[in-house]
Design a protein with these regions (language model features):
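Phosphate-group recognition and catalysis centered on beta-loop-alpha active-site segments
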Residues: 1-484
């Protein structure tokens, strides 16, 4: 259950935060609900709204129309400028059929809220969390039709307290959950959600909640919870995966936070791009220009490292990453060596420098290098242990690549993938990698490629690929994935 949406990647409680949950195939999101001066329910955690110009508006003292004028995005990042407050009606329209909602009622009209849920046809997708007095008012308007949930602690009474107050679920702090508590509530037909925020939002407490039998985990790290749980259930993966420029969906691409996130998500490989500055230093950057992903300007090849070192590589992603810079190749290798395999996209670096860096950090045998056949031939001459990954744009190119380069794998255009081509590659002792970037980032596409025998999928959407991995594993052995 994502707390205020994917609030680490988009402004909390906004359309963008909800949309990201839907795109990641998350099942539940927690949102906060308040009432405006003109009686409209809106999504907001704090009672006071702060705009990109630092203006402050008390939600209960302003109309929805007035609040809709406030820019909620600029404080997060300039790319979100113009993001507006979401009404509950708009939230329901977006979530219907796509995302279940935990409504954390900060200041609502209970009777009106119950009617709005029913009128929107959201009874089966919503649970309302509030104090008991307001929950009773919801129940009086729609007895048995709207799911109700409240906080439970041992001092409020035995588990029978929940059904006696018309609740269908309870929230319990993650440090208090036990198997005995869960079993007692489940015996009464009551679901259990654990609040795993703050210091409790880490693997030890996630495991504690799962082991206790919790039905939901509320978290600010839904992507990590999902990955952590999946890899405990699935030990033998049907395919390996690489995260493109690191976990670029959750942190700025080609930065240390993106690669650290990728490792926590269980990536087999991280892909990264290397370019050279005007004074011969090596930095991670995809584009030839600095303008796209940093606050710098111009070509990196015409910029000295003294300038590069002072740039922000994160401010355009989100202001919380404003102090994150472009890592040097050595900084990157120091951070990840031995933790994950490396997919080295040699954008602009001499073969000799590339080989020397891999040797210096002891990662020669954990690296594949992507580049043109001519460039890779030079790498092979430097050190034949380095695994080579040339592009394969046409099946007709395969035999020549196999004969002249003897690559470890080929980076195959997704559009030419087939069972027959993959079998041909395997017969030549060549693995098949492919980028599912863009239009092929779909569960059905991943599943087809896995069925054909692909060895590695590169993705920008790890949770989508994980969904496909779980489906593939379950179809082959319904008992192998286990129960959540």
């Amino acid at each position: 259950m994502a707390h205020r949406g994917e609030a680490g990647q988009a402004p909390e409680n906004t359309r963008l935060a909800l949309t990201r949950c839907i795109e990641d195939y998350l099942e539940w999101e927690e949102v906060d609900v308040r009432l405006t001066k003109d009686g409209k329910h809106v999504l907001a955690h704090d009672a006071v709204l702060r705009s990109g110009t630092n203006a402050e508006l008390t939600i209960a003292e302003h109309t929805l129309e007035e609040l809709k004028q406030v820019d909620l995005g600029s404080n997060f990042a300039a790319r979100f400028a113009g993001e507006r407050m979401l009404s509950l009606a708009e939230c329901f329209a977006l979530a219907k059929g796509n995302l279940n909602l935990y409504l954390d009622c900060k200041a609502v009209n209970p009777e009106q809220l119950a009617r709005e849920i029913i009128d929107a046809g959201m009874e089966k997708q919503v649970v309302v969390y509030d104090q008991l007095e307001r929950l009773r008012r919801c129940h009086e308007v729609a007895p048995g039709k709207v799911a109700l949930m409240a906080k439970w602690r041992p001092d409020v009474g035995p588990p029978s307290w929940a059904p006696s107050n018309h609740l269908v679920a309870v929230e319990i702090d993650a440090d208090s959950i036990t198997p005995e508590i869960c079993r007692a509530f489940h015996a009464l037909g009551i679901k259990v959600e654990t609040k795993n925020l703050g210091d409790w939002d880490r693997p030890a407490y996630w495991d504690k909640s799962v082991a206790a039998g919790a039905d939901w985990i509320q978290t600010d790290l839904p992507e990590e919870v999902m990955a952590h749980a999946l890899w405990q259930r699935i030990k033998l993966r049907p395919v390996r995966f690489s995260l493109h420029r690191g976990a670029n969906r959750y942190a700025p691409e080609n930065t240390l936070p993106a690669f650290e996130k990728a490792i926590r998500l269980g990536a087999d490989f991280v892909e990264f791009d290397v370019r050279t500055t005007s004074d011969g230093k090596f930095y991670l950057l995809h584009d030839s220009r600095l303008d796209g992903k940093t606050d710098g300007h111009g070509l990196i090849s015409e910029t000295p490292s003294s300038i590069i070192a002072g740039l922000s590589a994160g401010v355009k992603f989100g202001r919380s990453y404003a102090k994150v810079g472009l890592p040097t190749l050595d900084e990157f290798l120091n951070a990840v060596a031995g933790k994950v395999d490396l997919y080295f996209d040699a954008k602009a670096i001499a073969p000799e420098a590339l080989t020397a860096a891999l040797k210096r950090h002891g990662v020669v045998e954990r690296t594949v290098v992507y580049g043109s056949p001519g460039f890779l031939a030079k790498i092979k001459a430097q050190d034949p242990r380095i695994r080579l990954l040339p592009p394969l744009g046409s099946p007709d190119e395969l035999e020549v690549l196999a004969r002249d380069l003897k690559p470890y794998a080929v980076d195959t255009d997704w559009n030419i993938l087939s069972r027959e081509l993959i079998a041909r590659c395997h017969a030549l002792n060549i693995k098949v990698f492919s980028d599912a970037l863009g239009k092929h980032e779909r569960v059905e596409d991943y599943l087809q490629a896995m069925d054909w025998g692909i060895d590695l999928i590169q993705t920008d959407h790890p949770l989508r690929l994980m969904r496909a991995i779980e489906l593939s594993t379950t179809r082959k052995d319904p008992t192998s994935a286990g129960a959540e």
